[in-house]
Amino acid sequence: MHILMYRWKAYNYRDIEQTFRLLGHTVDNIEQELGNYDIDPDFEAEIEALMEKKHYDMVFTVNYFALISNTCQKMGVKYVSWTCDNPLISMYHVSVFNDCNYIFTFDKTNYLEFKEMGVKHIWYLPLAVDVDRI
């Protein structure tokens, strides 16, 4: 699987990327500080250009970013996010209903809330740790 990973200052990217690679997936990273998690035309264009240049099976992020969800929806690429913060204000956006989304949250109450709101692709998934590194 070819994965495009948006990296920001989250603490758990190293372990997640390492696990993807150990499972045989290829991972490309994109990093950019975002001033707005909902709309950033320049960053959206950059992601689209990467997707047009190379096939990606999914885009992965730690925490949820509406602008990435909307870009994936437009490009027909799966968007997988795994939350590590709660409350995660960025999830309270209409884009959580996009069909491209596969949202995993470590907070069961958060999962139940969004499931009840009608978000189709949301699951409860506790946070993980690299037990070999500890």
Question: What name fits each language-model region?
Answer:
Residues 9-19, 23, 28-115, 133:
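Extended catalytic core of nucleotide-activated donor transferases of GT-like folds
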Residues 128:
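Carbohydrate-associated surface elements
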Residues 1-3:
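Extreme N-terminal starter segment of soluble prokaryotic enzymes
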Residues 119-124:
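A short alpha->loop->secondary-structure connector
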